[in-house]
Curated annotation (Swiss-Prot):
Highest taxon of source: Bacteria
Phylogenetic lineage: Bacteria, Bacillati, Actinomycetota, Actinomycetes, Kitasatosporales
Catalyzed reactions: a triacylglycerol + H2O = a diacylglycerol + a fatty acid + H(+)
Activity dependence on pH, as recorded: Optimum pH is 8.5. Shows high stability over a broad range of pH 4-9.5 (80-100% of enzyme activity). Becomes unstable at pH over 10, where the activity drops to 34% at pH 10.5 and to 8% at pH 11.
GO function terms (MF aspect): carboxylesterase activity; triacylglycerol lipase activity
Thermal properties: Optimum temperature is 20-30 degrees Celsius (DOI=10.1016/j.enzmictec.2008.01.009). The His-tagged protein shows a higher optimum temperature of 55 degrees Celsius, and a thermal denaturation midpoint (Tm) of 66.63 degrees Celsius. Is stable when incubated for 30 minutes at temperatures in the range of 30-70 degrees Celsius at pH 7 (DOI=10.1016/j.enzmictec.2008.01.009).
EC nos: 3.1.1.3, 3.1.1.-
Protein name: Lipase 1
Length: 268
């Protein structure tokens, strides 16, 4: 902000200058505050399930200090940071319980949502424990939901975000492909792995389309996770963990910092 030094010997000039400064101050006071708060919405891929270092006050939402929203906020120091993403969240949960911090002062919103609506957890359980035909059938059911029902649910969430945070830049974060193909992978056939990856692509396509329709940016993490899928030499995803089943198929801390954070940095 410029500083003005008033030099004058005539009272009329002093008064005129004072009036000018008063007008300028009034104009400045009328300007809205900058929108530079950050709100992180979504499901377990945003809250950081699988990354560890969970914030105790987040309870079952399992928000991690190693999750990409937390890492981004630590690096960029937004004026405010509200972390409402929650493990297990569906679109309805975002609408009912996560949008409170959004306002005209929100400058950035990130969100990953849709996987739970499409039945991701049940699909993966079916593919791991049941036959190839059962796996493919369950994937087909999930894809049909993604085509027929999910777009409307995403539109409801995205419209609500725009209404509550009209000045925000919104980044819709996608999901990785889960398996490296062409390698030996215990427990899952190549056919199952291929179908699961295609289902992830299918979901990402719909997410990107609906994001674009609302003027949002889509953050595609499939490229950053290439070479770090399950059955690769250095996976950034947890495989099935029977001792902590909730972390299965979720990004590790390295997946959050190396797979998700660069995408958010580039899109924000």
């Amino acid at each position: 902000m410029r500083r003005f030094r008033l030099v004058g010997f005539l009272s009329s000039l002093v008064l005129a200058a004072g009036a000018a400064l008063t007008g300028a101050a009034t104009a400045q006071a009328a300007q809205p505050a900058a929108a530079d708060g950050y709100v992180a919405l979504g499901d377990s891929y945003s809250s950081g399930v699988g990354a560890g270092s969970y914030i105790s006050s987040s309870g079952d939402c399992k928000r991690s200090t190693k999750a990409h929203p937390y890492l981004w906020a630590a690096a960029h120091s937004p004026s405010t940071f509200d972390f409402t993403a929650c493990s297990g969240a569906r679109t309805g949960d975002v609408l009912s319980g996560q949008l409170g911090p959004l306002s005209s002062g929100t400058g950035l919103v990130s969100i990953s949502i849709g996987g739970n609506d499409a039945g991701f957890a049940d699909t993966m359980t079916t593919c791991v424990l049941q036959s190839e035909s059962s796996c493919l059938s369950r994937i087909a059911t999930a894809e049909a939901y993604v085509d027929s029902t999910l777009p409307g649910k995403l539109d409801g969430v995205y419209s609500a975000i725009s209404d509550k945070a009209p000045n925000a830049h919104v980044v819709v974060i996608g999901y990785p492909r889960f398996y490296k193909l062409g390698t030996t992978c215990i427990g899952l056939s190549e056919t199952k792995r291929t179908a699961i990856n295609k289902a992830s692509d299918h979901l990402n396509t719909v997410l990107a389309q609906r994001a674009a329709a609302h003027g949002f940016t889509f953050g595609d993490v499939r490229t950053t996770f290439t070479g770090h899928e399950l059955c690769s030499g250095s996976p950034w995803l947890h495989s099935v963990n029977w001792l902590n089943i909730g972390e299965s198929y979720h990004p590790t801390a390295a997946g959050q910092s190396g797979g998700y954070l660069p995408v958010l940095n580039g899109a924000a």
